[in-house]
């Protein structure tokens, strides 16, 4: 409401403008009333135009009002109005009216000129003031204008300020010319002349008469030929004023005895001369002619002083002291006498004496002139017109009769040429148009005035036109309908066409409006598209004229009629009635059903359509409770009655009331089938919006389970629209029991239409089935029902509470991270989701589907968050460690020259290491490790969204752990025994040294030697020595590094034995070989299948 008030409230500027204009109008009305009542200058009452009006404009504080008060003019109304007659002392608020015996002076507010405080208000008030002047004195709004500008503004103002004053005054002058429409003289008053240093001292000796004189320059009347206008002589005129001052200077110096005053007298002509430049610039800025503006009529420039008292003098003298090199206090001691200088004769002798210079408004004068001429001309024209009209009427009627005679013969020949075989209505259109217009159009003004002959000719023309319509137009319409019926079409098309056809042949069933509608529809669809609108209008006009009175019955093709009836009787009557009812336009107060309206404004946040249709897509209001009660029940029985009345179309009757009742029941059954299909399709198409993350899942659950749940609203709306027995549980027996007043009346009407027989003689109608709609949706309706009295909670409340509990858990999970996300938060969400899913199992299918959709989407989004967290931990905790310490190093990369450190290897693969910890913390609950090949628990891979192949990586890591870290911890330890078996005969002895652990063999008895990798001393050196050296000259092999033993195994042949802990190792040196038996300490050992080599990690799970 507050925002509405802000919008509707008027702004302050508009209010202020209205108030200002109202004040100006009030002052104008007061002034005009005074002028009408007062006797100015004698007993003669003067009107508005007898006294000249002058407007005074200028910036605020320019001394306009002071000049008027000290002008010496007589104000005769002061005695009548008291002090109030002299308004504006201390500043003019709007506009003050000064009534003298010689003129009316309008003193305007200075802000109207500058418009620099409240520009919008001041401009509107100024223009409104000009409109008032123009309204009251249309011919001559003003007789002149005074421009008042203070010399203090010119002396103390900057160049920019003076330019702004000049621009503002120039704009006001142009607005005066444009708004008032007259060219008036302009007088510039330079006020506060006394503020020029030395003024008082120089002119102090003037007497009253001398002070009343005009001191300035009056220009010659501007003829518009000079490019500079009157300002061309400004410099010369100003020089004359300087000469006057200089001529009087010696006299004044001799008269003055005070040295300080003599100094000021002496400097005054110089100070005055210093005004020339700034005055010239200012006047050029205001009055310099411009070809794009009205040329001002500048009459003169005059210096005045109204009073010499008050603080402005002291301030100005202080500001001037420095420029004159005088002592400030020396100047400040000069005070004025408060007398006026050079004002009085300026008004009386200069301005008022030239009151005739202003012209009148040319637009107003031209209007007055033309009004006078028009009145005289109109009188003469009336006399001439009356005489001419009778002559023109007589001649026009003679021409009219001759024109009708000329049209008759060609028309008769055209009608005779028409062939009965022609079927095209357009072929007869020219003849019909000609006969229809035979008598011509409505009489013109020249044919009237009592001499018109068209009425007699028109009656005969109308008779001929009617006969032509029946003879050539009607048969073509009948033939066209026959063509339509023979061409086939839908059952409804043939039925309606046959009805129109039979109406033309039977007076008993004639309906002009129906025939007209059928033919018009055919023309609209089948006439050539290039047919002009005029031709179409003519055809419709002829059709209206033909059917206005029933034409003679047409001869019908009975074979065609019988054939059509046989076709039409194949469609059940009930279906025909239902199709008619369904095509009816719904009343405006029976709205369509929209999910967006039913579920509320939050519906788009939670619901969507599987088909992609918007939630605003309507289900016809025909299939709503109101559509059923207010449209279908009425329309079905009405249409059943109509079909009964139209059984003549099919050539049969419905004479039995039972048949009519059964027909209504069949129509109702078709409606219910359609009703169910529409609602089932709509609800089956409803789903929950796609949920992509846990945060969105929480939002959806919050909205669905909240106080304004769109889920509850939608179900309640569906229940309202599908409980057709609401308010009248006996509606299913309406035909039999008349439980509804409206239905009972329509049933009686139907009975009267089809005819009622005696109670005992007629066949009883079939029993009505129970309402299938209410039965079909009974479970859904009971879900939102609040029980008897509406005081018990609806069953849906329990479901919504479970969904709210799920929302709470999901919301908590949305803010969880790390172990919490993968642990308790996930488990609690899963438990809450299971409760909701269990509750949904007991709900109607539509509710069950929607709720399960929400639960599944929520679970999926939860697992998606879990998957994201798993991947984040995988990359940061596993992959990054693997890349830094193991990737590309031996033994992971078999051919790499770089070794992984045993510490890094143990940290990654050891018991409690990186791989083992990640698996136990995140994945172990979802994996079955009991089988030889690990597998996911049922459904776990799909829920987590993890590639099933990831388990192979973890199982292989576990195999590495079991092979290298049997004792636990993160230090790899491998124990085994080596026993020489055979050795080449060329070798007498070989020695294997593994970090100080030696195995020696010289073809004697062999004994197993226990070894451990890595050894306690941690040298990381393996040496294999043979004696004697082979022919190549190399006697042995040395490998270094923490993985030297396994590098030796890679260079040798290692074959599995008959048990997982026994292997045959064949060592080779330049073609010589030594075979040993390798016995591992455990079946879980690193010697089988190269358990480490080729191990890799996926980038993401």
Swiss-Prot record:
It is found in: Cell inner membrane. Keywords: Cell inner membrane, Cell membrane, Membrane, Transmembrane, Transmembrane helix. It comes from the Bacteria. Disulfide bonds: none annotated. Disruption phenotype: In the deletion mutant, TssB1 is still recruited to the structure containing TssK1, but the assembly of TssB1-sheath is aborted likely at the nucleation stage. It is a single-pass membrane protein. The chain crosses the membrane at residues 371-391. GO terms for cellular component: plasma membrane. PANTHER family: INNER MEMBRANE PROTEIN-RELATED, TYPE VI SECRETION SYSTEM COMPONENT TSSM1. This is Type VI secretion system component TssM1. It comes from Pseudomonas aeruginosa (strain ATCC 15692 / DSM 22644 / CIP 104116 / JCM 14847 / LMG 12228 / 1C / PRS 101 / PAO1). The lineage of its organism: Bacteria, Pseudomonadati, Pseudomonadota, Gammaproteobacteria, Pseudomonadales.
